[in-house]
Amino acid sequence: MVIVKKISAIEVLDSRGNPTIKTKVELCDGSIGEAIVPSGASTGKRERLELRDGGEAFGGKGVLKAIKNVNSMIAEEICGKDAYNQKAIDDAMLALDGTDNYSRIGANAVLGVSMAVARAAANSLNIPLYRYLGGANACTLPVPMFNIINGGAHANNSVDFQEFMIMPFGFSKFSNALRAATEVYQTLKKILNDLGHSTAVGDEGGF
């Protein structure tokens, strides 16, 4: 058992220049875990609620309300709990919120704490995060996915589909899969240039 000692959060900017939450969790043995919450450009109707501030700052996309929830009610609930019991941590935050979609304290507030606790626990055990989450038998990394053409809400063009993605299967190392995808991306760029098409990138980095 290792106890969660301190939880704090600050506002940072994501890759699109929009505010998001960076959460830091410190355990009693000195281990630290940090996490920055991702955010999509489009939102599905079943997605959990990101708590945003509204108002004028950052076009209403500020996350100071969610940060306040992390630094107050979530910290009060989670500090003192066993960081090695991830399910108990997550269940405690779900119970604290009391809604089906985290509309009270914000899914962005909850996700940052959950990820940071997991990373702190992995660091406490001096093992990689994938090993901590996957257990002793975790030996296969997921196949990476790469967005190479953007449309829909992710680009200012007439393409109906939002994402065209590739998955480089069959490589023994992640680095080789990454290289293969990069080569496909650069080859596609050359083909588009040769055909006189735009190679400006969309919201997800695809053409």
Curated annotation (Swiss-Prot):
GO terms for biological process: glycolytic process. The keyword Zinc does not apply. The active site is at 204 (proton donor). Catalyzes the reversible conversion of 2-phosphoglycerate (2-PG) into phosphoenolpyruvate (PEP). It is essential for the degradation of carbohydrates via glycolysis. The keyword Acyltransferase does not apply. This is Enolase. Gene3D superfamilies: Enolase-like C-terminal domain, Enolase-like, N-terminal domain. GO terms for molecular function: magnesium ion binding; phosphopyruvate hydratase activity. Its EC number is 4.2.1.11. It is found in: Cytoplasm; Secreted; Cell surface. Pathway: Carbohydrate degradation; glycolysis; pyruvate from D-glyceraldehyde 3-phosphate: step 4/5. GO terms for cellular component: cell surface; extracellular region; phosphopyruvate hydratase complex. Belongs to the enolase family.
